[in-house]
Amino acid sequence: MTRYIFITGGVVSSLGKGLASAALGALLQARGYKVRLRKLDPYLNVDPGTMSPYQHGEVFVTDDGAETDLDLGHYERFTGVSATKADNITTGQIYKTIIEKERRGDYLGATVQVIPHVTNEIKDFVLSPAMDETGEKAVDFVLVEIGGTVGDIEGLPFFEAIRQLRQDLPRGQSCYVHLTLLPFIKTAGEMKTKPTQHSVKELRSIGIQPDILLCRCEQEIPPEEKRKIAQFCNVRPSAVIQAMDSSSIYAVPIDYHEQGLDAEVLDVFGMRDAPAPDLTRWKTIDDTVQHPDGEVTIAVVGKYTVLKDAYKSLIEALHHGGLANKVKVNLDWVESETFEGDEGAAAARLENAHAIMVPGGFGERGAEGKIRAAQFARERKVPYFGICFGMQMAVIETLRNVAGIKDASSSEFGPTERPVVGIMTEWIKGNETVQRRANDDLGGTMRLGAYDAVLTAGSKIAEIYGATEISERHRHRYEVNIGYVHLMEDAGLKLTGRSPNGVLPEIVERDDHPWFIGVQYHPELKSRPFAPHPLFASFIAAAKEHGRLV
């Protein structure tokens, strides 16, 4: 029997519902249960693929090619369960489906309304088969996070749907967890419970009585305040769970367990004889974070650096590399435009970095700065890791400054006589050929999801992976032009990874450099704290070695 846990938020956004959902999933896993996490996003976009990173943050890509919310990255990293298209839905997708059904005549002339048609689509999504990773057995728990906060007009159909689900499901098969804020007013020296009371009042006004309150706070909640919250919010005092800031995000499962979150959830389901959790691996990770053997500084040269959520998976993957090497990873965020128009700016800013990371991105803005970062890394023998756009800029840098093709560029930046990087028009997906054109819609038209690659035997990349065949996740529309590979290799940048049909360049590396690798895919999307991606583990090891040498 599958049980459902609905996680909602109140008072303000960005309290950490995604992290709380992921941590609760990890705690249930630690007790031996199978879990799957899903996200309901109330915005009207079909997916976040065309949304600005400044507004939405990172777009997390699944193996099956879904462009999803960054919270699915938290889910994967904390549970190790790979998300799919079936784990994220938006209002845009729901309305698109309903309108298509109406045009086909599926509703048999009925007036199409929010209730029941929209709410039924939401319920069907929530209740769709949730299988474990073998695909053979249903999971024990489905955790469903509702985006936004209670009271948002966009979220009303979702709250109505989960209200109905409590009645639709057998008794004792659902649980509501509400994440809220307990602000501490320093001038008054008091913790204020009124925002939480009003948030729960709003939730109850639409027919949802939370079973558990997860209260974000800066200080410990005094017992009398817990009793007050419980009384006014109609929950047991034991169901008022304190959620203070943790020393690191990987300490969150431990902290929530100590506060009794998982035990309280299981009590709601009447599962009082559940196995005790095994939190050994989380304690090991937290101990490594708290007691590193050293530090390294990684310069991250990007264009969305003012909003760190735009690089959420990348940040975590770099820290996973630190865990693998038992070092603390300090990130020096460098706006790539800083280097444009100033020859010495790159050298001055990157001088103290132990390694340089140039992550993915889109568009011409900041591109020249990334090219200069790649040049600095190549000339100074500083470890360099280019991901997606970062690989493309490394190729352009080599062809400009080593091969002497001064006008080498990307067709993404406009018409060019030397399209070293060009738009992809055709590639293989499974057994089918996918075709795209420059004037296609932007949404959902990139090369998305997991693709295989073949690595050159004896190359550094093959040594790092310990294999010559790999599968990684992609999200890109442009690719290194295969017609320039011979010039690139003559200039010292070797192509050591291709698509299985040999047409698409996937990986480049320099054999005259301690660690200089560019990959067209996004390895950060598959890294886990308890299974760091080998590329990030190797990159941080190279940074550690470079730091020792300098």
From Swiss-Prot:
Enzyme class label: ligase
Domain Glutamine amidotransferase type-1 stretches: 297-549
Coiled coil residues, start to end: none
Residues at which CTP binds: S13, D152, I153, E154, K192, T193, K194, P195, T196, Q197, K228
Binding site for Mg(2+): D71, E145
Gene3D superfamilies: 3.40.50.880, P-loop containing nucleotide triphosphate hydrolases (3.40.50.300)
Binding site for L-glutamine: Y54, G361, F389, G390, M391, Q392, E412, R477
InterPro entries in the record: Class_I_gatase-like, CTP_synthase, CTP_synthase_N, GATASE, GATase1_CTP_Synthase, P-loop_NTPase
Kinase recorded as keyword: no
Residues involved in UTP binding: S13, K192, T193, K194, P195, T196, Q197, K228
Pathway(s) the chain acts in: Pyrimidine metabolism; CTP biosynthesis via de novo pathway; CTP from UDP: step 2/2
GO biological process, alphabetically ordered: 'de novo' CTP biosynthetic process; pyrimidine nucleobase biosynthetic process
Recorded superkingdom: Bacteria
Active-site residues from the entry: C388, H522, E524
Region (Amidoligase domain): 1-271
Entry binding sites for ATP: S14, L15, G16, K17, G18, L19, D71
Binding partners and assembly: Homotetramer.
Misc. comment: CTPSs have evolved a hybrid strategy for distinguishing between UTP and CTP. The overlapping regions of the product feedback inhibitory and substrate sites recognize a common feature in both compounds, the triphosphate moiety. To differentiate isosteric substrate and product pyrimidine rings, an additional pocket far from the expected kinase/ligase catalytic site, specifically recognizes the cytosine and ribose portions of the product inhibitor.
Protein name: CTP synthase
